[in-house]
Design a protein with these regions (language model features):
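Short catalytic micro-motifs in class I SAM-dependent methyltransferases
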Residues: 98-103
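Short, glycine-/aromatic-enriched active-site segment of Class I SAM-dependent methyltransferases
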Residues: 128-149
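A C-terminal cap/extension of S-adenosyl-L-methionine-dependent methyltransferases
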Residues: 127, 160, 170-218
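Hydrophobic/aromatic residues located in beta-strands of well-ordered beta-sheets
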Residues: 56, 126-128
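A short glycine-rich, Lys/Arg-flanked "PGG" loop and its adjoining helix->strand segment in the class I
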Residues: 110-122
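Conserved N-terminal segment of class I S-adenosyl-L-methionine
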Residues: 1-90, 94-96, 108-113, 173-177, ...
Length: 218
């Protein structure tokens, strides 16, 4: 297999941290429901769904990172979200978009949200998790470590895009469980940067990730 030119997983949080902070999102779904995890990677969120008897389906563009999930027997397919949702006519109870939207240009994100709306059952939910640019660590360092990142999406803009695409926003805000789990060099400086940003950059008051949960209208 040809080696991929860039492997962003070297900057990922450790699996136990991802599992810990994503567990609350898995609890949104009920046993027997079907959830599509876009950009599922090795399948951590799919495992959390499986533990709750929720039917999880994962897709990812990186054949390299999804091999572990396939080896675990998880339902994972290789492909990108836009092509997958155009071809698949299945209806889902939920769609998970964890650290996906920052890789998309605005027209592609709107296209993705409109396709997601078509593929969701009535009252189906979408969960978005994305970097928080009010975290100075994110804005000045970690966001730019991934060369596939296109742009950040702050919550007011996300809310507008979801409502434009036929969703009602249920909740949104800072994810209190993120902001840790990054590479050690980031954690060592976290306290110093926290004090500095409070003094020098008062507006950079966020931490870690932001989230938005939306429901299909109708």
């Amino acid at each position: 297999m040809k080696k991929e030119p860039f492997n962003p997983t070297i900057f990922y949080a450790n699996p136990s941290f991802i599992r810990r902070y994503q567990s609350k999102y898995a609890k949104i779904f009920l046993p027997g429901e079907t959830v599509l995890d876009v950009g599922c990677g090795s399948g951590i969120f799919l495992e959390l769904l499986q533990e709750r008897q929720v039917n999880g389906i994962g897709i990812d563009t990186s054949a390299e990172v999804l091999r572990d999930g396939i080896a675990k027997g998880l339902h994972i397919e290789h492909g990108d979200a836009l092509s997958y949702l155009k071809k698949k006519k299945n209806l889902y109870d939920g769609i998970m978009l964890s650290h996906i939207i920052e890789h998309l240009h605005p027209p592609d994100l709107i296209n993705l949200l409109e396709l997601a709306n078509k593929r969701l059952k009535p009252n189906g939910r979408v969960i978005v998790i994305t970097p928080n640019f009010k975290d100075i660590d994110v804005a000045t360092s970690t966001f730019w470590l991934d060369i596939t990142h296109v742009r950040p999406y702050p919550l007011p803009l996300l809310k507008q895009l979801f409502e434009y695409s036929g969703f009602s926003v249920v909740s949104m805000g800072n994810d209190p469980d993120t902001g840790g789990g990054r590479p050690p060099y980031s954690r060592v400086l976290s306290f110093i940067r926290y004090i500095y940003r409070k003094i020098r950059f008062g507006q950079y008051s966020g931490k870690g990730d932001i989230f938005l949960i939306a429901k299909k209208i109708g």
